[in-house]
C-alpha cells in the first residue's frame, strides 16, 4: 500500500507542533513521537506502509553499506596496536549492549551507583558556575539557556538560525549542572546533524557530550571536594561507552555476508535484542549517530577517541597520552565543522591537556587500589 503524503500538510502539522512548544515551553512523549514522525516523512514523496515496519526511510540499507565500507577501509589503515584494541573492544561488547554494568564498565559504574551519586553531589556544589562555562556557548551563538521552573528539561535548536533554548530545572534526582550538560549535548548533536528539529536523539547526545566536557572540566577541577574528578571521569566513560557500542554495532554490520534489511534485522535481534517492531526506529537513529562520520578520516577520529578512553580506563598512561594527542586534533576538527576555531584556544588546551594530568593521577590511584 502506498500513501501519498502532502508536504504542505506535513509542514503545517510540524509548524503547529513547534509553535506549541515555543508557546508552552513543554512537550511530552506524544509530541516527541509526532515530530519524529513528521520529520521522517518530510523528504519522501512516496511512503511505503507495511504492517510490520511502517515508514522505512529510503536509502537506509545503502547508508549502512556505505558506513560498512568506510569502517573497513579506516580499520585497515589503523596502527596495528589500535586495530587490535578496537577488535577486542567490539568483540567484548558484543553481548553487553543493554547492560551498563557489563565489562569493561563495571568498575566505572558500580552497581551501588556510588560514582554517579558522587558526581551529582559535586555538580550541586558548582551550580553557581554555570554562567562561566556557558559564556563560550553564548558568544558563539550555539544555544540560549533559559532557567525555568518546569517539570521537565529539553533542548530546542534552530540549526539554520543557530539559536535555540535549553530548559532545565533541578529536582531531587539531578542538578542544574547535570541536566544542562546533557541538554547541551543534544544541541551539539542536532547542529552537527544539520537538522532544523525539535526533538532529541539520546545516542547522539551521549556520544557528543564528551566534547561539551572540555568547557566544563576546568570548573570541576577548581573545587576542593575530595572526589572532584569523579564527575569528569564518569562523563568521559559514558561518552566512551556510547561511542564504542556504536562501533560494535557497525562492526557486526560490516561483517555480514550480505547487508540487507533481513540480515541486519536478524543481527540486531541476536546480538542486541532489538525487537523487530523497533527495528526501523533503532536503525534510523543509529544512522543519525554516524551522520557526521561519513568519511574514512572521520571514522578514524572516532577510533582515536575510543583508543584514548580505553587506555585511560586500563591505566595505560603511555598509550593514553599517545592516543590523547591524536584525539586533540580530532576534537578541534570536530569543532571546526561548527565554525569554532579551538585549536589555538587557551581554554581548550588548558582543560584537555594540562588538567588531564590531574585526572591521570586519579585513574592511577583507582587502578592501584583494585
Regions flagged by a language model, labelled:
Residues 221-293:
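Long, amphipathic alpha-helical stalk/connector segments used for oligomerization, subunit docking
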Residues 180, 184-188, 208, 299:
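Active-site His/Glu-centered metal-binding helix of metallohydrolases
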Residues 44-165, 352-366:
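Contiguous, non-catalytic segments that form substrate-binding/exosite surfaces or channel walls
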Residues 161-181:
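Short pre-active-site segment immediately N-terminal to the catalytic Zn-binding motif
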Residues 66-79, 94, 263-370:
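C-terminal, non-catalytic "cap/extension" segments appended to globular domains
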